Regions:
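Flexible, acidic/Gly-rich N-terminal and inter-domain linker regions that tether
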Residues: 1-33, 40
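C-terminal scaffold of the Radical SAM
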Residues: 15-30, 50-83, 89-365
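Short loop/turn microsegments at loop-to-beta-strand junctions
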Residues: 34, 286-287, 388
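Local cysteine-cluster metal-coordination motifs and their immediate loop/turn environment
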Residues: 35-50
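Short amphipathic alpha-helical interaction segments
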Residues: 365-379
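A short, conserved structural fragment
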Residues: 377-388
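Minor-groove-contacting beta-hairpin "wing" of winged helix-turn-helix DNA-binding domains
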Residues: 388-394
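Short, amphipathic alpha-helical interaction segments positioned at domain boundaries
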Residues: 395-410
Length: 410
């Protein structure tokens, strides 16, 4: 089941933000994340805030149903307009995630996007993305999305091998994600991503190479590759504990990452974040870069997180409770956190060190600067950028990114 919400102070019922959060807003990009919390089935490795029809039965009634969801989410978009006041910014990015957004009719996703356009306006070059499961779209659906303003789509491929997909409880067949890329291109999508997962129990190096070859052969301009993390409370964790499938160790994850980086570099893809590769700067995911670079975004939907001007908040998780709050004219926010200058400095290091241009050494405290010199000597930071005043991870540093970050912020 979904993980717990963080601790924090209560969110005001009207969703209002302190004045300092809105000061200078015009100088920061603004994005929207729209969460669609519905899935046809729950994948065994997933602990995201998503719900199947069975899980929702009797827990929220009509308010929790996906049939009314677009209208409910649009209510939060209108709340965002009230909270942000006369904020002049046009929205730079919109990302619809889940869950499985494409379980909703394409017309619902288009209406949600239209609400943002009506309330805020969209930048002329706005990036508009939706996630999609390969089995939940067809050419007509993709054409409707493209005609409605979406210009980027991200397909959950995960693997090209049937036995790996089976362990992950994915329901699409091998070959379907690659066909989806062709269908998306035919519909006019400018940018297409494929998500891959490595380190699934039972996956071999050859399986992983085959998945990479299939993904690259489809011709997306962006590929994300993530190590499988086995979260407590998931079906996969229970299967591993019972000895039904083996646990993959960190050395295997490292080997698979090295394979991915080498194969993608040969194919003309460059890393720009530890888990993300693109064929060009234009192919990068601008929405994720808003997160990584500490910009402003409003997260709408159950369990969605937001950040504006150093204030971070999160919504109630259950779709029924979320819809009930908005129906009563209340913010669905469950809590918030006011970030101090030190919080923001540390968070910037945590996020930006994972990027290809790293972080300025001037951000580091004395202890972190000393740690950076050791990381440089150990081959974890690149010497050229370091001499120019930036901490940038080497390939070996990317393998140990979490440890390097911890050392630099301590």
């Amino acid at each position: 089941m979904p993980s717990a919400l963080p601790d924090g102070e209560p969110m005001p019922e009207d969703g209002s933000l302190p004045s300092h959060a809105l000061a200078g807003a015009g100088d920061r990009p603004l994005g929207f994340y729209l969460h669609v919390p519905y899935c046809a089935t729950r994948c065994g490795y997933c602990d995201f805030n998503t719900y199947t029809a069975t899980e929702l039965r009797g827990t929220g009634g009509v308010l929790a149903s996906r049939e009314n969801y677009a209208d409910t989410l649009i209510d939060e978009v209108r709340l965002a307009r009230k909270v942000l006041g006369d904020d002049p910014r046009a929205v730079r990015t919109v990302f619809v995630g889940g869950g499985t957004p494409t379980l909703l009719p394409a017309a619902d996703l288009v209406r949600m996007l239209a609400a943002i356009r009506d309330e805020f306006g969209l930048a002329e070059d706005a990036e508009i993305t939706t996630e999609a499961n390969p089995e939940s779209v067809d050419p007509q659906y993709l054409a409707e999305l493209r005609a409605g303003g979406f210009n980027r789509i991200s397909f959950g491929m995960q693997s090209a091998k049937q036995h790996v997909l089976k362990v992950l409880d994915r329901t699409h067949t091998p070959g379907r994600p690659e066909a989806c890329v062709a269908e998306a291109r035919a519909a006019g999508f400018e940018h297409v991503n494929l998500d891959l997962i490595y380190g699934t129990p039972g996956e071999s190096d050859d399986d992983w190479r085959a998945s990479l070859a299939a993904a690259l052969g489809a011709g997306p301009d962006h590929i994300s590759a993530y190590a499988l993390i086995v979260e407590e409370g998931t079906q996969l964790a229970r299967r591993i504990r019972r000895g039904e499938v083996p646990m993959t160790d960190d050395d295997v994850h490292a080997d698979r990452y090295l394979i991915a980086d080498s194969v993608m570099a040969e194919a003309g893809y460059s890393w720009y974040e530890v888990s993300n590769w693109a064929t060009s700067e234009a192919g990068r995911c601008l929405h994720n870069e808003l997160y990584w670079r500490g910009a402003d975004w409003w997260g709408a939907g159950p369990g969605a997180h937001s950040h504006v001007g150093g204030v971070r908040w999160w919504n109630v998780k259950h779709p029924g409770a979320y819809a009930a709050a908005l129906a009563e004219g209340r913010s669905p926010g469950a809590g918030r956190e006011l970030l101090s200058a030190e919080d923001r400095r540390v968070e910037r290091i945590l996020l930006e060190l994972r990027l290809v241009d790293g972080v300025p050494l001037s951000l580091l405290a004395p202890a972190g600067l000393a740690a950076s010199r050791k990381a440089l000597a150990d081959g974890l930071l690149a010497p050229g950028p370091y001499e120019a005043g930036r901490a940038v991870l080497t390939l070996r540093g990317r393998l140990l990114a979490d440890a390097v970050v911890r050392d630099l912020v301590d």
